[in-house]
């Protein structure tokens, strides 16, 4: 999945 997923 290449979507904006913040690692916080």
Swiss-Prot record:
Record-level GO cellular component terms: extracellular region
Summary of the tissues where the protein is detected: In larvae, expressed in the ring gland but not in midgut, CNS, thoracic perisympathetic organs (tPSO) and abdominal perisympathetic organs (aPSO) (at protein level). In adults, expressed in corpora cardiaca and corpora allata but not in brain and thoracic-abdominal ganglion (at protein level).
Molecular function per GO: hormone activity
Keyword annotations: Amidation, Hormone, Neuropeptide, Pyrrolidone carboxylic acid, Secreted
Residues where Pyrrolidone carboxylic acid is found: 1
Residue numbers of Tryptophan amide PTMs: 8
InterPro entries referenced in this protein's UniProt entry, alphabetically: Adipokinetic_hormone_CS
Subcellular location(s) of the protein: Secreted
Principal place of residence: secreted
Keyword Secreted carried by entry: yes
Single GO biological process annotation from the record: neuropeptide signaling pathway
Family under the similarity heading: Belongs to the AKH/HRTH/RPCH family.
Its job: Probably causes a marked increase in hemolymph carbohydrate.
Entry protein name: Adipokinetic hormone
């Amino acid at each position: 999945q290449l979507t904006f997923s913040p690692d916080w």
